[in-house]
Regions:
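Glycine-rich anion/phosphate-binding loops
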Residues: 35-58, 85-105, 124
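Glycine-rich, proline-tolerant flexible connector loops at the mouths of alpha/beta enzymes
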Residues: 66-92, 114-127
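N-terminal binding-site loop/beta-alpha segment at the start of enzyme catalytic domains
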Residues: 15-16, 23-46
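Conserved, mostly hydrophobic/aromatic
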Residues: 26, 59, 63, 103, ...
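Non-globular sequence segments
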Residues: 101-104, 109, 115-136
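Catalytic domains of carbohydrate-active enzymes, especially glycoside hydrolases
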Residues: 50-75
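Loop/turn elements at helix/coil->beta-strand transitions in domains of secreted/extracellular proteins
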Residues: 21-22, 64-65, 107-109
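N-terminal amphipathic alpha-helix/helix-capping segment at the start of soluble metabolic enzymes
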Residues: 2-28, 103
Length: 136
């Protein structure tokens, strides 16, 4: 990669409401770590959100300016599976603070991808325009 060809890649980007330290963006990907099931205190048998916080912190340490999380459902009906992550109350919101703080320690930003699974949801309470499950 020629430095002159991508001369702005490592320069800050002012978005008006915040500034990214560079223009490197980690796109959303589903890792399976999102499936945490926040319980009392934001922890469960799999360690709550600590593994996800460590995962994103390593990417922030690597220098990425903006991280987009994997899909998090806005409610129970929008989950991909019964154990998938969601954020629809204060407990779940507080549980995500560790992730945000871990990323911010390295001057990176993070944005949550909100994902309503619709007919791709595989559980008995999902809501979609069609009762037919997606074939994938």
């Amino acid at each position: 990669m020629s430095a002159s060809k991508y001369k702005n890649l490592l320069k800050p980007l002012d978005l008006g409401f915040t500034t990214l330290k560079n223009r490197l963006i980690m796109g959303s990907m589903h890792t399976g770590i999102e499936e945490f099931g926040v319980l009392k205190g934001g922890h469960n048998q799999r360690g709550g959100l600590a593994p996800l916080a460590r995962y994103f912190e390593e990417r922030a340490k690597g220098g990425v300016g903006l991280i987009v999380t994997g899909g998090i459902a806005p409610n129970r009906e929008g989950k991909v599976s019964p154990w998938a992550g969601k954020m629809s109350n204060k407990l779940e919101s507080r549980a995500h603070r560790d992730i945000t703080e871990a990323v911010h320690r390295h001057d990176s930003k993070i944005v949550m991808q909100i994902l309503h699974a619709g007919r791709y949801g595989y559980h008995f309470w999902n809501v979609a325009p069609s009762p037919i499950k997606a074939p994938i």
